Design a protein with these regions (language model features):
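N-terminal mature ectodomain segment of secretory-pathway/periplasmic proteins
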Residues: 167-242, 274-292
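The canonical Cys-X-X-Cys-His
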Residues: 69-79, 116-126
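Bacterial N-terminal signal peptides
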Residues: 11-24
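Acidic/charged, solvent-exposed loop-and-adjacent secondary-structure segments enriched in E/D, K/R, S/T
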Residues: 235-266
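Gly/Pro-enriched, hydrophobic low-complexity segments
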Residues: 219-220, 297, 301-400
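Gly/Gly-Pro-rich "capping" loops immediately C-terminal to redox-active cysteine motifs
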Residues: 51, 80-105, 131-145
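N-terminal cleavable signal peptides for secretion/export
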Residues: 50, 140-201, 398-402
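Mature N-terminal segment immediately following signal peptide/propeptide cleavage
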Residues: 36-77, 159-186
């Protein structure tokens, strides 16, 4: 029995993805988790994507699933059943290896190794790339998708003016300087195979500690979902994932640090380097699948916002783009890009429903989306400057399934 449908393909990537292109889980995990884990140390039959951290490997699976509109069962034998054989080679996995090598060769020969051609370049949610332009598309209204890298144009609002407006809108520099921690509670709804609601707790401690804990108390056999960063190390534990919990060492670690720092608006000017402002644009709320929208009927969807754009680099050069509401000055979206051998991997966090909490504006609605899933979080309470147990930011306790 499948744990997902094709409409939940991206969630399926995070649920069980044990492999590119062919993989089975090894048994010696716990001791190795204290060190950076490479894909070939954890999975079997890794022929192409060797030498990359496990978190970057999982993100690579997300790129493939997104580009071809696949789920795990399209490439892995009996995926979604008790009889799954991750290590078995299939024609599609063999073909995928060849395609990864082909893309690398194209980029090396034509673009100096820069990732100008990826799976998404040609496939665009199709198994086989479209080779003939449909006339409806040619003569219809073009869909202009923004580039990852923002172009700096003279005459735009300065970075300082945008960030100063955000600081003032969030409560002002003096009040923000007094924010040392906060704890929030509410509900979260997962995507696809992670559908269903859970209780959520978010804990943050200045300057760079953050944890999101989602408790699925009504789901028998499902463990808790945890994303934690303690200022140096990051951990993820996802229900139904073949890895249980694992330590972040690749791009997701850099992203976790940025997420934690952005929890405290007063330090916005210290988070990114090589920072620049791009042209203002319009963004629209991320679409919600039925598995989420049906359980959050009071959450408005499809709203558009005119925004100012700021982009810079986080730890180890990770590319981060921030979108600020032109009217209010508040942060509406964080879009960061991780690395993989076959292209950038986007993670998007949308912020909405800002409310005053002891003089500071904080978002009560958060949508966290990545290539492997989407969490829709609605908070009902935020408490500021409260004691927080440091253990919340560290390695998760052993998996507690029900």
């Amino acid at each position: 029995m499948k744990l997902w449908t094709r409409s939940g393909a991206f969630a399926a990537v995070e649920i069980v993805i044990a492999a590119l292109i062919g993989a089975g889980l090894t048994v010696a995990q716990p001791a190795a988790q204290e060190k950076p884990l490479l894909a070939e140390q954890v999975f079997k039959n890794i022929r192409v994507l060797r030498g990359i951290p496990v978190d970057d490997f999982l993100q690579t699976m997300g790129i493939m699933a997104a580009a071809l509109q696949f789920d795990c069962s399209d490439c892995h034998v009996a995926a979604g059943t008790a009889n799954v054989d991750w290590a078995a080679d299939t024609p599609r996995k063999v073909r995928a290896r060849a395609m990864v090598n082909m893309v690398a060769t194209i980029n090396k020969a034509n673009f100096g190794g820069r990732q100008m051609v990826t799976c998404w370049t040609c496939h665009r949610s199709r198994d086989k790339p479209l080779i003939t332009p449909p006339l409806e598309t040619v003569y219809g209204t073009p869909i202009i998708e923004p580039d990852d890298v923002v172009m700096q144009i003279p005459g735009l609002p300065s970075v300082d003016s945008i960030l100063d407006k955000y600081i003032q809108a969030s409560g002002g520099a003096q009040r923000l300087a007094g924010l040392t921690s906060y704890s929030a509670t509410g509900t979260s709804v997962g995507f696809g195979g992670f559908g269903g609601g859970g209780a959520v707790e978010i804990a943050a401690k200045f300057p760079d500690k953050r944890a999101t804990i989602i408790l699925f108390s009504k789901e028998i056999g499902r463990g808790d979902e945890i994303r934690a960063y303690d200022g140096r190390s990051g951990w993820v534990r996802t229900p139904l994932n073949v890895l249980g919990e694992f330590q972040l060492t690749g791009s997701d670690l850099d992203g976790a640090r940025v997420d934690a720092q952005l929890s405290f608006p007063g330090q916005i000017k210290q988070i990114l380097t090589n920072i620049k402002a791009g042209p203002s644009t319009t963004i629209t709320d991320l679409p919600a699948p039925a598995s989420q929208s049906s359980l959050q009927g009071d959450v408005p969807l499809g709203q558009s916002h005119r925004v100012e754009v700021v982009q810079g680099n986080g730890p180890r050069g990770i590319l981060v783009t921030l979108y600020f509401d032109r009217q209010t000055g508040l942060l509406l979206r964080e879009l960061r890009y991780g690395n993989s051998p076959i292209g950038r991997t986007p993670t998007q966090i949308d912020f909405a429903d800002y409310r005053d909490v002891n003089g500071i504006k904080l978002p009560f609605r958060i949508t966290h989306a990545w290539l492997g899933g989407r969490d829709s979080i609605v908070l009902n309470e935020i408490k500021t400057n409260v004691p927080i147990d440091e253990a919340k930011f560290g390695k998760p306790a052993p998996l507690n399934t029900r």
